[in-house]
Regions:
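Catalytic pocket-lining loop regions of alpha/beta-barrel enzymes
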Residues: 1-26
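Sequence contexts marking disulfide-bonded cysteines in secreted/extracellular proteins
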Residues: 3, 53-55
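Structural alpha-beta junctions
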Residues: 21-29, 108-114
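C-terminal regions of proteins
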Residues: 22, 34, 103-106
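Short acidic/histidine-rich active-site segments
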Residues: 26-45
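Short secondary-structure boundary/capping segments
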Residues: 47-52
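Mid-to-C-terminal alpha-helical segments outside catalytic/metal-binding sites
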Residues: 61-143
Length: 143
């Protein structure tokens, strides 16, 4: 998830590749994602500070507050855990409530809203997949 200074938007490479594959195979261009809520060992780590996962690769465009949601209808301010301010940039994704920061981080890297759109269509994609499964099941039962 580290930014590549030579390639703005590089954080979106895997999403773009996945959507291209889905579309190429006739699927609805959407991508769901989830996190294992039993632990955050595999959660995205920090891009900045002493615990960075980016090694010596220089990073730019940290998440700053306030920022506006993808839909533009919510303004996010610095999150807190009790009295402690949480710094997504140096602590990474500590909890699922920092999902807006993860999306904003990709936007700051140059991933466009159009490229992020498939993340916000995942519920529709799930319903379409379910409908196809129901149709296929009915066809199999009719044999």
């Amino acid at each position: 998830r580290c930014a590549d200074p030579a390639r703005p938007g590089a954080m979106g490479d895997r999403l773009r590749e996945r959507i291209a594959l889905i579309t190429e195979h006739g699927g609805y261009p959407a991508e769901g994602f989830g996190f294992d809520l039993n632990g955050f060992a595999g959660a995205p780590g920090p891009r900045f500070g002493p615990n960075t996962e980016c090694g010596a690769t220089p990073q730019a465009n940290p998440v700053t507050y306030p920022f506006t949601s993808y839909a533009g209808d919510v303004t996010f301010t610095q999150p807190n855990l009790g009295a402690r301010a949480v710094d997504f940039n140096t602590e990474g994704m500590l909890h699922v409530g920092l999902l807006p920061e993860l999306i904003e981080d990709a936007r700051r890297d140059g991933v466009t809203d159009a490229e992020l759109e498939p993340l916000f269509r995942s519920a529709e994609a799930y319903l379409r997949m379910w409908e196809r499964a129901e149709t296929r099941a009915a066809a199999l039962r009719a044999r």
